[in-house]
Swiss-Prot record:
Keywords: Cell inner membrane, Cell membrane, Membrane, NAD, Quinone, Translocase, Transmembrane, Transmembrane helix, Transport, Ubiquinone
InterPro entries for the chain: NADH-Q_OxRdtase_suN/2 (IPR010096), ND/Mrp_TM (IPR001750)
Protein name, as recorded: NADH-quinone oxidoreductase subunit N 2
Gene: nuoN2
GO molecular function terms attached to this record: NADH dehydrogenase (ubiquinone) activity; NADH:ubiquinone reductase (non-electrogenic) activity; quinone binding
Organism: Opitutus terrae (strain DSM 11246 / JCM 15787 / PB90-1)
A single Gene Ontology CC term: plasma membrane
Amino acid sequence: MTSFVSFLPELVLLAGALALFVVTLGQNNVRLARILSVATASGVLVAALATVNHSAVLFSGAYRVDAFSQLLKIAIAFGYLCVGILSGQLRDIRGEAKPEYFLFLALSMTGLLALVSSIDVITLIIALELSSFPLYLMVAMRREREGQRVQMESAIKYIMFGIAANGVMFFGFGYLYGLTGSTSLPVILEKLPPLLSSPLAVTGLALTLAGFLYKLAVFPFHFWTPDVYQGSSNETASLIASLPKLGAVAVLVRFVSLAAPGHETLATLLTCLAIASMVYGNLIALVQTDLKRLLGFSGIAHAGYVMVGFVAMDNFGFASALYYIAGYMLMVLACFVVVCQVSRDGANVAITELAGLHKRSPLLAVTLIVGVFALAGVPPFVGFMAKLNLLTSAWQAGHTALVVLTVINSAIAIYYYLQIVRAAFFAESDAQPAPIALTPSMSALCVLLIVAITLLGVAPAFTIDAITNSLATISTVSS
């Protein structure tokens, strides 16, 4: 019975996915599919909150429910609920595919929930593929515009890069299995650290990390990001930009913690990835005019910020990285709420189209400025506290140069974020733009994101302590 209750979030989500599958078999009932999707997300969030203190090892030791996994499931469920509400209209998804869109959304979330609890290579691979393949299909569901099939180009790029990254990752898993003789992460945790002086062990770990760095869009695994953001629908882009990255960071924490603290080779590799991602993402974002492409290149830079937390290779650094990516999920979702509402008929939004937003919808304007200022690291929002923790962890670990470069890159990023604010609050449109009417659910989502972003920045102690305490369960997996 305890095992059944511990598995409750996944069971609720599977039940919701089954109900959505039944809906897709009948008439094109988009409204019912939308209601079921939001209800499922709400149920998963309640179930995750109810089981936050549960622990269990399931499926012959391949699946572990602990404080670490359950805390992440709460964040994933909250993000799922936000995306479900955000996907209320799906203006740019083909009409006949809209019910299937919500089904694939549920299946992808099922994979993410399984990903954060998987402690065996086999279940990890299954969860990763389950979370990825529905996203490939969701990108391709965008309707054609003026004979262009940009959504198919984006989907093909996403699939091809994804398959290549997964192939490299599986190759790395093969090395780890050959060195340790097991697919169980607890066994690998026990046997791998003494072997890290071996080139094969370092190669295996590096290849394995490559697959998750692809999900996080870390340089040089970032090539797909701006094109997929631009080619997918606004709602799909909001999903790809947020939730999969949370799952990727969670698994990266499990793998990087395999290395002994102070392992110089891995720390140097992570430092190079962090610097390259920050510099490349911020410099290219400076010249973007399409808002989704700007958020895509900005996401590459933020992936570099996350890697700063991993460089410390201790629990404080890992907790800082998790706190940052959870905050980033909220920040980028706030920006995509504005993109979805400003967009005319689901089209991409240029920065200049934000002109007069403070008059068209004051609530959307506030949501945008909170999201953008948080991304820029302006207090009192979560982006400031999260970035401060990352810098502190790297400073304490002796990576002074990395801290300085991170601060410089953060200053560069402020320029293009202020361009967004300037367009929304100070630029005037040539024509008289119509007011943007928000539905009650969309207004509630805006308020929820504003409160969450502000609250996590003003009072971060509870969240950081919860994450830090949950990390202790990773080290006890082998016991």
